[in-house]
């Protein structure tokens, strides 16, 4: 009886921890190790199991976008147009020259044509039979000066025509005497025949009578206006021969372009 009790007591005693062995799996590895070495199975639905790809940086994306935006601009950018005019024809060959487009707007041609109907300007052009103050090149310079001054076309009046014509004579003519008669046509409208006055005679006449002194004050005012007109053009009074030809080519059949000194007999 005592031996039986002793065996029962020994069977209920706890075994040492070292003698316990972990539970083995069917493969012979501990369960804990098997769990650690497991490969993850398929992920949840809707989740990409592949590792995420490395996306391009924002700077690189922006460069790509800039390059793609520049391509249509390069394709759509218009090339500068050139104007070619046929100059001579020789058999089947044609010689052409390039001509730049005139910057004079049509409204300034209209202002010029309107002022040609002024009675005082008509008398000046009719009087100048020798074309000493109003040949075709000087009149073309008037249109160029209208364009450079930049006033609206409806603001140009008789005084502006005389200012531009006088300034054109200053630039192109060496003889000072003929252009002095422009003053008399502007301020003395009743005269139909005015002799060409030299500078000395002009200086003498202004001291002889009160009327001449009045004209002297008007001439001084005219020269003041001429200076203001010259400044409004930003002091650009020189006009090239090419530009003068372009102005005449706008309306080549205009009657003022027949005022050529080369055609005088």
Curated annotation (Swiss-Prot):
InterPro entries: Speedy
Regions of compositional bias (Acidic residues) in chain numbering: 66-80
Disulfide cross-links: none
Region (Disordered): 1-80
A family per Pfam: Spy1
GO molecular function (one): acetylcholine receptor regulator activity
Region forming the signal peptide: none
Family: Belongs to the Speedy/Ringo family.
Function: Acts as a modulator of the nicotinic acetylcholine receptor alpha-7 (CHRNA7) activity.
Protein name: Speedy protein E11
Source species of the chain: Homo sapiens (Human)
Name of the gene this protein is made from: SPDYE11
């Amino acid at each position: 009886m005592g031996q039986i009790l002793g065996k029962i007591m020994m069977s209920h005693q706890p075994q040492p921890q070292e003698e316990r062995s972990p539970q083995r799996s069917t493969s012979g590895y501990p369960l804990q190790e098997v769990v650690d070495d497991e490969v993850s199975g398929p992920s949840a639905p809707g989740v990409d199991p592949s590792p995420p790809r490395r996306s391009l940086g924002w700077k690189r994306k922006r460069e790509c976008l800039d390059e793609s935006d520049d391509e249509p601009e390069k394709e759509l950018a218009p090339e500068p147009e050139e104007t070619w005019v046929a100059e001579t024809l020789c058999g089947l060959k044609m010689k052409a020259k390039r001509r730049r487009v005139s910057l004079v707007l049509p409204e300034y041609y209209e202002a010029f044509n309107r002022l040609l109907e002024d009675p005082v300007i008509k008398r000046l052009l009719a009087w100048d039979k020798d074309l000493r103050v109003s040949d075709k090149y000087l009149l073309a310079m008037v249109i160029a000066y209208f364009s450079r001054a930049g006033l609206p076309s409806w603001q140009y009046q008789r005084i502006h025509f005389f200012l531009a014509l006088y300034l054109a004579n200053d630039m192109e003519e060496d003889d000072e005497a003929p252009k002095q008669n422009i003053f008399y046509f502007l301020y003395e409208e009743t005269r139909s025949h005015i002799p060409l006055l030299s500078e000395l005679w002009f200086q003498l006449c202004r001291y002889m009578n009160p009327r001449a002194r009045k004209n002297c004050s008007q001439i001084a005012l005219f020269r003041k206006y001429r200076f203001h007109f010259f400044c409004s053009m930003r002091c650009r009074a020189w006009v090239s021969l090419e530009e003068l030809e372009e102005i005449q080519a706008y309306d080549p059949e205009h009657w003022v372009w027949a005022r050529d000194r080369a055609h005088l007999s």
